[in-house]
């Protein structure tokens, strides 16, 4: 009887310790390094995809990459959901144009751009990031911190 209790207690401790590893993400999301990810095979332009992500879960946005390992995880996950191609990431020039500066160091106050702001997508044929008009339609991956 003592051995049964010991083994049962050991299994309970093991179960409780393992249950916290992926329990922070909803069941239809995937977990990696404290973040939850979900690819969507619902092509949208960048702004609509970002808006869609914010409605899926508190704190959710289009995916951002902090390491090669994270990018590899997300790419594999994404292409299990949709075929190879492209998908939106959360990187864009929409929100912050302070990267632009005149050569005389004057701040950029007036603009007359010919094109819309650019957004970044991941291209599977060479695993590189590319920028294009934010109006393009693409699949996307949402992410939030668990």
UniProtKB/Swiss-Prot annotation:
Source organism of the structure: Deinagkistrodon acutus
Places the protein is found: Secreted
Residues annotated as signal peptide: 1-23
Principal location: secreted
Listed InterPro entries: C-type_lectin-like, C-type_lectin-like/link_sf, C-type_lectin/snaclec_domain, C-type_lectin_CS, CTDL_fold
Role this protein plays: Anticoagulant protein which binds to the gamma-carboxyglutamic acid-domain regions of factors IX and factor X in the presence of calcium with a 1 to 1 stoichiometry. Also inhibits platelet aggregation by binding to platelet glycoprotein Ibalpha (GP1BA) and functioning as a blocker of vWF. Is devoid of hemorrhagic and lethal activities. Possesses antithrombotic and thrombolytic activities. Also hydrolyzes the Aalpha-chain of fibrinogen. Does not affect the Bbeta-chain and the gamma chain.
Quaternary structure and partners: Heterodimer with subunit A of agkisacutacin or AaACP; disulfide-linked.
Stated name of the protein: Snaclec anticoagulant protein subunit B
